[in-house]
Structures are given as structure tokens and as C-alpha cells.
């Protein structure tokens, strides 16, 4: 998929002309940085990396290169654990960074180092449907109708897929007579309508948008808007369900790697820049919900209000509990998703 059309010239002008991004003045570091990120952040970090490098050079006189690696969040976390030399990680959910921290690569207190539990922007899960919504898919209950083909990635490898699953679980619990048994039955029926599980969100978007597979894509809000912008309002509609989930993609410095590579100052400045006005404005342009009130207000009606549950809802109990119960080997997802059954 091609990049979202965002004016980098405007962004860079604002960055260079405005106040310095935090941490730039004092930082001295090596000339390259690797951000290991999840699937649908490609366009955002392409723009952000170029803007950050330009601002860094203007402030320090040093030319640097910020690179990015993208894939399913769980697979990306595993790659870092297995030796991929990330300076920073910007993943889909806190559990994936906790998994890296558990191997000693990131300090246990990583989530307290930056504001908002180290999540500089938020997102949610929406439905992307064919133009005119021919199957009438308006809420989670519609996804289990006979003959509906649902496109979603694999929760074992994709952070977005885990958010998709949990949003559906929360909706089912809140229905009249809702219970955990009924939520499990609901998701079992939903996943019978999923013909194939891609490993990451971008792969699922490609399957739906470019290959014409499925009737509905369960998508990150920004990914749905990217498809809408790139392929035209005459091809797709975006549906906001009655209930979704507050996704808080977190960021962290990979301590062991930056200390070995001498890139800590650069890596810390890079993540701090995500919270600066320019970083927040760029996040909003790419349909990530900014934390900064001014950036959110400037976005106008770009982000519809909807009811959102959080991962700390008693239904989930935080990421450690949710991961163990739903997504670890032998968890509920393994019972729910049984291809060919």
C-alpha cells in the first residue's frame, strides 16, 4: 500500500521553525537508529523519521538516519528478543514490550518513563466494508451472520488482532444475558467466518483492499482511514460499532541495545519527540488519536466519539491476565479457532 498523502513540507517547516523537541539540545549519539514497530505504522513513521532527522540536524548539526522495521507486533517482539538490534520499540500493546523486558533487554519500569504509561497516542478498532455496506454490517452481532466473510489477522502474531478479539469479547459480554460462555460462543462463530488469518494487520488490509477478499475488515482506525484515502471514497465505507476498545500502543527504549551501541540519547530524544506538538499533530494526521489536547482539538471531527472499554476492564484484568487466558498456548483462542471444524 502506498503512503498516506501527508505534507511533510508543512510538518518540517513547523518543526524547524518551532520550539526545540525535548532532549535534542543535550543529546550526542551515533548516526543511526532502528525503530522496531508494528504493522500499520509504516506511513506514520516514514514521515516522523524524516521530520525527526531534519530537526535533529537543525538542532545539533549532526546528520542521522532513523530506520524502521514493521510486522505483526508479537512477531516483532520475538525478533527483538532473538537479537534484532532495535534502539526503540513502538509496538501494538504493552504485553509485547513486557515480553522483551522479561528477557532483560528493557528495564522493568519502562512504562513509567514517559507520559501516559509510555503510550503517546491511542487508537481503536473499526469495520472497513465495501462501498454502500451491501451486507448491512453495522455492529459486532452482524459479523456472525451466515455467509459473512470476516478478515482479521492472527492473534498469535498480531497485536491488532488481539485488540479485535477483545473488542468483540467485550461487546458479547455486554449483550442481554451476556456471560463468558456466551462471549466464547460468539467468538467461535465469528472465527468460523474468518477464511484465513494473516500474520499482521497490513497483510489483512492487503487481502481485503487489494485482493478483494471478505466482506468486512476488522481494522485499526488509522489503517481503515489509510485504505479509504488511498483507494477512494467510492470503494469503501468505515463503520464505527456501538462498542470498541481503547488501544494504547506503547513505546520504549531497548536499554541493553542502546547502551551497547551508544545510542541512548538519540533513542530517548526520538521517543520524547512523539509527545511534542509536531509529533502529536503528525499522529493525528495519520489518524492516531493524539494525547495532546490541542492536537486533538485541531483534528476537529476526525475522531468520532464512541464507547470504549479498556484492557484494565474487569473482563480482562490487564494485559498479563488477558494474554495468559486468551492467547497463550492452550488459551481460549486455541479452543475458539479450529479451522475446518
Language model regions located:
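Periplasmic-binding protein-like
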Residues: 119-124, 184-191, 198-199, 231-264, ...
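Extracellular/periplasmic juxtamembrane helices and adjacent flexible linkers that interface
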Residues: 258-341
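Bacterial N-terminal signal peptides that target proteins for export
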Residues: 2-10
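Short helix-loop capping/hinge motifs at secondary-structure junctions, enriched
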Residues: 132-138, 170-178, 257-264
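Ligand-binding pocket segment of bilobal, Venus flytrap-like solute-binding proteins
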Residues: 175-242
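N-terminal export signals
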Residues: 10-27
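Short beta-strand->loop
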Residues: 36-38, 129-131, 149-176, 191-194, ...
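N-terminal segment of the mature folded domain
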Residues: 29-158, 300, 337-338
Amino acid at each position: 500500500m502506498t503512503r498516506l498523502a501527508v505534507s511533510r513540507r508543512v510538518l518540517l517547516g513547523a518543526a524547524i521553525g518551532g520550539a526545540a523537541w525535548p532532549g535534542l539540545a543535550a543529546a550526542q549519539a551515533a548516526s543511526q537508529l532502528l525503530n522496531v514497530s508494528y504493522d500499520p505504522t509504516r506511513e506514520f513513521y516514514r514521515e516522523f523519521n524524516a521530520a525527526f532527522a531534519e530537526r535533529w540536524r537543525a538542532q545539533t548539526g549532526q546528520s542521522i538516519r532513523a530506520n524502521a522495521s514493521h510486522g505483526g507486533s508479537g512477531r516483532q517482539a520475538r525478533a527483538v528478543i532473538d537479537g534484532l538490534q532495535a534502539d526503540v520499540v513502538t509496538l501494538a500493546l504493552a504485553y509485547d514490550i513486557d515480553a522483551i523486558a522479561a528477557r532483560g533487554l528493557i528495564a522493568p519500569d519502562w512504562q513509567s518513563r514517559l507520559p501516559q504509561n509510555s503510550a503517546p497516542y491511542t487508537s481503536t478498532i473499526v469495520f472497513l466494508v465495501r462501498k454502500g455496506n451491501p451486507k448491512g454490517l453495522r455492529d459486532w452481532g452482524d459479523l456472525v451472520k451466515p455467509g459473512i466473510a470476516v478478515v482479521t489477522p492472527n492473534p498469535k502474531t498480531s497485536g491488532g488482532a488481539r485488540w479485535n478479539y477483545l473488542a468483540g469479547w467485550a461487546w458479547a459480554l455486554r449483550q442481554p444475558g451476556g456471560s463468558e460462555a456466551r462471549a466464547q460462543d460468539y467468538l467461535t462463530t465469528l472465527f468460523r467466518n474468518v477464511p484465513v488469518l494473516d500474520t499482521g494487520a497490513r497483510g489483512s488490509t492487503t487481502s481485503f483492499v487489494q485482493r478483494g477478499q471478505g466482506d468486512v475488515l476488522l481494522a485499526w482506525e488509522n489503517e481503515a482511514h489509510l485504505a479509504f484515502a488511498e483507494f477512494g471514497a467510492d470503494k469503501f465505507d468505515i463503520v464505527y460499532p456501538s462498542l470498541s476498545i481503547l488501544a494504547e500502543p506503547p513505546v520504549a527504549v531497548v536499554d541493553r541495545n542502546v547502551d551497547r551501541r551508544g545510542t541512548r540519547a538519540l533513542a530517548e530524544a526520538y521517543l520524547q519527540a512523539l509527545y511534542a506538538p509536531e509529533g502529536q499533530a503528525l499522529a493525528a494526521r495519520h489518524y492516531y488519536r493524539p494525547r495532546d489536547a490541542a492536537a486533538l482539538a485541531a483534528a476537529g471531527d476526525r475522531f468520532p466519539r464512541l464507547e470504549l472499554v479498556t484492557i484494565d476492564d474487569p473482563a480482562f484484568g490487564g494485559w498479563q491476565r488477558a494474554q495468559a487466558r486468551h492467547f497463550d498456548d492452550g488459551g481460549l483462542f486455541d479452543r475458539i479457532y479450529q479451522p475446518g471444524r
